[in-house]
Swiss-Prot record:
Keyword Lyase in record: yes
Species in which this protein is naturally found: Psychromonas ingrahamii (strain DSM 17664 / CCUG 51855 / 37)
Family: Belongs to the LuxS family.
Cofactor: record remark: Binds 1 Fe cation per subunit.
Subunit and interaction comment: Homodimer.
InterPro entries the UniProt entry points to: LuxS_sf (IPR037005), Metalloenz_LuxS/M16 (IPR011249), S-ribosylhomocysteinase (IPR003815)
Protein name, entry field: S-ribosylhomocysteine lyase
SUPFAM superfamilies (alphabetical): LuxS/MPP-like metallohydrolase
Function: Involved in the synthesis of autoinducer 2 (AI-2) which is secreted by bacteria and is used to communicate both the cell density and the metabolic potential of the environment. The regulation of gene expression in response to changes in cell density is called quorum sensing. Catalyzes the transformation of S-ribosylhomocysteine (RHC) to homocysteine (HC) and 4,5-dihydroxy-2,3-pentadione (DPD).
Cofactor annotation: Fe cation
Molecular-function GO term, any one: iron ion binding
Assigned EC number: 4.4.1.21
Amino acid sequence: MPLLDSFTVDHTIMNAPAVRIAKTMQTPSKDTITVFDLRFTVPNEDLLSEKGIHTLEHLYAGFMRNHLNSPDVEIIDISPMGCRTGFYMSLIGSPSETEVANAWLAAMRDVLAVEHQEEIPELNKYQCGTYAMHSLAEAKTIAQAVIDAGVGTNKNADITLSDEQLKQL
């Protein structure tokens, strides 16, 4: 089985909250696709609550688009990681980590401004596979933790596992 890019970095030395450019690629029409690792919590130390991450999934994707989309950037998708330590964001374009971090913080402030659970987009049985599994309070706790900590960066050059390390694992 091929080794996925996300498993070539050392999760024991990742910082969080932090932005990492996980991958860039070119489409046949020469558009740049960038995949970001938006790490909310330190791997293997903490994880996002299931209701909190689900509510963030509904809110964060829209708020990030409000703050990051531009004539040069278009978010394709923002999806939670299975390990519940963050989200992956795929987009057309190549914004800097600083631009992404600033949009992330603005999106977290937007989460804090949501007053009622009923304001969560697509919160119904027709548009959500587990519409009862939400918590605005838990999403706000996550958002406040990100704001309080600030958003840094993880650089691949600093956290990539060597070929020798990968062989030993």
